[in-house]
């Protein structure tokens, strides 16, 4: 049958490229009989879109009803034809919304329909009339069967069905259907949106759907239209806003399209400027306070001494750089008139001042004792009387004592009353030697006088003992020869 229809001998090869070239050569031919390459291999297993097969769609009944609804030819002319005349390629011959598609492929599908009709026994005139009738069918009815044929953009069906279901396909222009969701070429700022009165006017091209879209989406007016680039430039965020403009322009337009109202409040340039000024003042004040605090702390930390109110320290502060010698000596004197005690550490001076004031902050917590002391070493010495601890041992005889002065007196006995370690009235050990004594000056003088008297008495006794020993030795030497 194919040989009878195609009245041309096979001149091309059987490769797909050769068949494609032959098909392209035949496009635009108005003859009802189209010559296509044919060979034994092509007739057996090749792909031929215009060749009738047993599995081709038979849409006679649907086409008959379709013709009646659109006012075309009678249903008998279409229903009486074979299934090849009603193939799917005849329906999609042309489309009013796609002129390029119609001009390029309209003749191809018309010729193929005429060839199939001739093969089925239908006259070429009737087949041509059928193709002409089908090409004049309005696209809105054909879109129900083949919605993707003749679309100007892949999102056109969603665009028409989502916003206005009554829009015809011919009313939607290519510019209006393909530009409203695109990213703007030059957005002003990352929060710059359309004016409240226009809605989507700047994001839609001029076309028929604008009136209906404005009527539907005009109520969704953005509340942050006054938040422009100047508000952020006053606060020093202009560069970051400009850098983020190309990232957020699409999302904010889609936010307005979907009907979500923004949550950002409106700000004016004056309020933003006031807030920026307040923030800068607060930051500068905090920085100045931090700098002042750090300088004061560093001055106290690296001054080499703690804060002291003794007369020597006050004099050094008054003299300034001239008082460096006083600060270098590190002498802290008691300010009580008539005392004149001088200490090398402020802690010793504070302990001494507690003796003047009578303050006794250290309390013995032994059962039924409750005695109070001026210094902590005094309390420790008192606690050893309760516990019986003897922490001072003699290095010669290993005898132990409770007080350090007792040990000092004992060591003198080993040295024959002279030299050796000089004892102190304090019972502090080597770890607490820096703690000053808190006895009164009278007691200290009394102790020193007693010690001197004892030393003098001991020296006199030693001299007397030596004289007695010398006299006894002389007598023995004088009587020795007489005894013999």
UniProtKB/Swiss-Prot annotation:
SUPFAM superfamilies, sorted: beta-beta-alpha zinc fingers
Record PTM Phosphoserine, positions in chain: 440
Keyword set includes rRNA-binding: no
A cellular component annotation (GO) from this entry: chromatin
Keyword Transcription: yes
Superkingdom assignment: Eukaryota
PROSITE patterns: ZINC_FINGER_C2H2_1, ZINC_FINGER_C2H2_2
Principal location class: nucleus
Residues spanned by motif 9aaTAD: 178-186
Subcellular location: Nucleus
UniProt record similarity statement: Belongs to the Sp1 C2H2-type zinc-finger protein family.
Function text: Transcription factor which plays a key role in limb development. Positively regulates FGF8 expression in the apical ectodermal ridge (AER) and contributes to limb outgrowth in embryos.
Record protein name field: Transcription factor Sp9
Species, as recorded: Homo sapiens
């Amino acid at each position: 049958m194919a040989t009878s229809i195609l009245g041309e001998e096979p001149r091309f090869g059987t490769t797909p490229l050769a068949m494609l070239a032959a098909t392209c050569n035949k496009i635009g031919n108005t003859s009802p009989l189209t010559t296509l390459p044919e060979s034994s291999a092509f007739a057996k297993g090749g792909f031929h879109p215009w060749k009738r097969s047993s599995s081709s769609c038979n849409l006679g009944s649907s086409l008959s009803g379709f013709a009646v609804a659109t006012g075309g030819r009678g249903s008998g002319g279409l229903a009486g034809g074979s299934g090849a005349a009603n193939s799917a390629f005849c329906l999609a011959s042309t489309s009013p919304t796609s002129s390029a598609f119609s001009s390029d492929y309209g003749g191809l599908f018309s010729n193929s329909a005429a060839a199939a009709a001739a093969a089925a026994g239908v006259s070429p005139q009737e087949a041509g009339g059928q193709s002409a009738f089908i090409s004049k069918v309005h696209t809105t009815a054909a879109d129900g069967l083949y919605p993707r044929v003749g679309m100007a953009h892949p999102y056109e069906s969603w665009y028409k069905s989502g916003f206005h279901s009554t829009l015809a396909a011919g009313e939607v222009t290519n510019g209006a259907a393909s530009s409203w969701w695109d990213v703007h070429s030059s957005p002003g700022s990352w929060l710059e949106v359309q004016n409240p009165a226009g809605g989507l006017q700047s994001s839609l091209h001029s076309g028929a759907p604008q009136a209906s879209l404005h009527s539907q989406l005009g109520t969704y007016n953005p509340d942050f239209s006054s938040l422009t680039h100047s508000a952020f430039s006053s606060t020093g965020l202009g560069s970051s806003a400009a850098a983020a403009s190309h990232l957020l322009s699409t999302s904010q337009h889609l936010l307005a399209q979907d009907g979500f109202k923004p949550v950002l409040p409106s700000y004016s340039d004056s309020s933003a400027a006031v807030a920026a000024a307040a923030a800068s003042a607060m930051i500068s004040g905090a920085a100045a306070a931090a700098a002042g605090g750090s300088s004061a702390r560093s001055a106290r930390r690296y001054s080499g001494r703690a804060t002291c109110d003794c007369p020597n320290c006050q004099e050094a502060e008054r003299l300034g750089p001239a008082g460096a010698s006083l600060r270098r000596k590190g002498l802290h004197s008691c300010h009580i008139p008539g005392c004149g005690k001088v200490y090398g550490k402020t802690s010793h001076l504070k302990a001494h001042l507690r003796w003047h004031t009578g303050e006794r902050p250290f309390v013995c917590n032994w059962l039924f004792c409750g005695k109070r002391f001026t210094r902590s070493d005094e309390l420790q010495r008192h606690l050893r009387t309760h516990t019986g601890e003897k922490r001072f041992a003699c290095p010669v005889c290993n005898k132990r004592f409770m007080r350090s002065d007792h040990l000092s007196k004992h060591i003198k006995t080993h040295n024959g009353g002279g030299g050796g370690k000089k004892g102190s009235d304090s019972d502090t050990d080597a770890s607490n030697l820096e703690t000053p004594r808190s006895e009164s000056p009278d007691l200290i003088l009394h102790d020193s006088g007693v010690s001197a008297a004892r030393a003098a008495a001991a020296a006199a006794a030693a001299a007397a003992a030596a004289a007695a020993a010398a006299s006894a030795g002389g007598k023995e030497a004088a009587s020795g020869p007489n005894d013999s």
